[in-house]
Design a protein with these regions (language model features):
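Short, Lys/Arg-rich flexible segments
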Residues: 1-148
């Protein structure tokens, strides 16, 4: 009984550890949504700011040699700072995580990213993957190891 109590008391801390150990997988879930222009709510990523439309206004080449046609949805990969700056944080209540990026910059760049209300976070499908394919198996191993 004491062993079970110890395991129960350590579950939230272990979930936090699991999240941080799998930060790159969680970030990949979010960035893959963005690459498909899908927000956490399942809707298309659209910039709600009147200053920015979220589409390339002219044909342009990227820093990496890629090409964007006028009218294409913005793909967030031009400089790479946005995706490189992604991180995951477990909130103080230990029951929720937050995904964000330090690569949103300041000034116009920050205003541009603020126009996307649904960019950070996981779709229902990716939340399922996080909970049942990433966290649960590791949590089950932890519990099995602790109670023998």
């Amino acid at each position: 009984m004491v062993k079970l109590q110890e395991v129960r008391n350590s579950l939230l801390d272990e979930i936090e550890n699991i999240v941080y150990r799998n930060e790159s997988k969680i970030i990949k879930l979010n960035t893959s949504q963005i690459e498909q222009h899908i927000g956490f709510d399942g809707n298309t990523l659209e910039n709600t700011s009147s200053l920015f439309k979220g589409f390339y206004s002219q044909n342009s080449f990227t820093e990496s040699g890629g090409f964007h046609r006028q009218g294409e949805l913005y793909d967030f990969t031009n400089s790479g700072d946005f995706f490189r700056g992604f991180n995951v944080e477990v909130l103080p209540n230990l029951a929720q995580i937050e995904i964000n990026s330090t690569g949103t910059g300041s000034g116009d760049k920050a205003s541009f990213f603020r126009g996307y209300y649904n960019i950070f976070g996981l779709t229902t499908q990716n939340q399922y993957i996080l909970n049942y394919e990433i966290i649960l198996p590791e949590l089950q191993r932890f519990i099995k190891q602790k109670i023998g």
